[in-house]
Amino acid sequence: MIIMRKTHPLLKTINHSFIDLPAPSNISAWWNFGSLLGICLVIQILTGLFLAMHYTSDTSTAFSSVAHICRDVNYGWLIRNLHANGASMFFMCLFLHVGRGIYYGSYLYKETWNIGVILLLTVMATAFVGYVLPWGQMSFWGATVITNLLSAIPYIGTTLAEWVWGGFAVDKATLTRFFAFHFILPSIVTARATVHLLFLHETGSNNPSGINPDSDKIPFHPYYTIKDALGLMLLLLPLLPLALFSPDLLGDPDNFSPANPLNTPPHIKPEWYFLFAYAILRSIPNKLGGVLALLASILILLIIPLLHTSNQRSMMFRPISQTLFWILAANLLTLTWIGGQPVEQPFIIIGQLAIILYFLLIVVLMPLAGLLENYMLEPKW
């Protein structure tokens, strides 16, 4: 008997990726976030498409077009709330996915890890240009502050900033091009996610123990399709109440006011998922230094495979490294909190200490912990 999914050229690829894929038998719920990110991406693309049908990317009508979507379009309020809060769930899954990769040593699949870091940067860029589109106060001033960082680049900075703006400040041309970027970038994210998956299936999934799982694998379907379906339900559990009952909980009240270049908000800050990076940017008094620290805080992920010193892949049996990992997680939460606070003492010094600890943990302490654990496990007789 010919089984269509095993012979048809297209179905065969899907079959090898999602049905007959051999998967380790012991992967935990931490491995659910990959599929959840895929689902988040689909939700964002679909809701975004329907929003784009009614949105106008002109400075004089952008704000009112968003109000029109919420008031006059059938279920427009729901589509917008799902899109805005779906972004928050997307980043929550993204951070947990990266955290799991660091904890269990998944970064040793270098190709998968590197394309993943590029994916993270692309998603961050997509979210940034998307936040500008409603053309509220925080949208406008957020765009002004972040794009102005380009002017910190020596020699070409000012020219580069004006090139991105399409003028001498954030204005109509900027909004139009940001809408174009926000429309095309999800397609690039989808393509890169496919490459990410392609590289992953070259090696197979890692597992909590970090040991080669080839001797004990099970088919992806039905075991992990059921597990991913449960993960989806648990994702919808916070997303739907958030979108239906308190959709503006994670937003900024300033964004309910139309953009006004003559009136600066008292505290300019991005969405919660960028606060850690914003805190790093603000913690350094020098403009160029802040920009470099901001870039380094994300790009440092690319060198994590080179800093792996342990004989064991996973942190599952490495208590010293585990402790440092959770200090790093707490440190990132501290940076997120600092990013939302005004630029005054004691927040400035807390932010500066947190950024020093962040780089110290990744570059020095965690590699040293790996070497120490190797030494402790060596037989001494």
Swiss-Prot record:
Organism phylogeny: Eukaryota, Metazoa, Chordata, Craniata, Vertebrata
Localization of this protein: Mitochondrion inner membrane
Annotated protein name in UniProt: Cytochrome b
GO cellular component, one term: mitochondrial inner membrane
Major subcellular site: mitochondrion
UniProt xrefs under InterPro entries: Cyt_b/b6_C (IPR005798), Cyt_b/b6_C_sf (IPR036150), Cyt_b/b6_N (IPR005797), Cytb/b6-like_sf (IPR027387), Cytochrome_b (IPR030689), Cytochrome_b_C_euk/bac (IPR048260), Cytochrome_b_N_euk/bac (IPR048259), Di-haem_cyt_TM (IPR016174)
Subunit structure and binding partners: The cytochrome bc1 complex contains 11 subunits: 3 respiratory subunits (MT-CYB, CYC1 and UQCRFS1), 2 core proteins (UQCRC1 and UQCRC2) and 6 low-molecular weight proteins (UQCRH/QCR6, UQCRB/QCR7, UQCRQ/QCR8, UQCR10/QCR9, UQCR11/QCR10 and a cleavage product of UQCRFS1). This cytochrome bc1 complex then forms a dimer.
GO MF annotation terms: metal ion binding; ubiquinol-cytochrome-c reductase activity
Keyword annotations: Electron transport, Extinct organism protein, Heme, Iron, Membrane, Metal-binding, Mitochondrion, Mitochondrion inner membrane, Respiratory chain, Transmembrane, Transmembrane helix, Transport, Ubiquinone
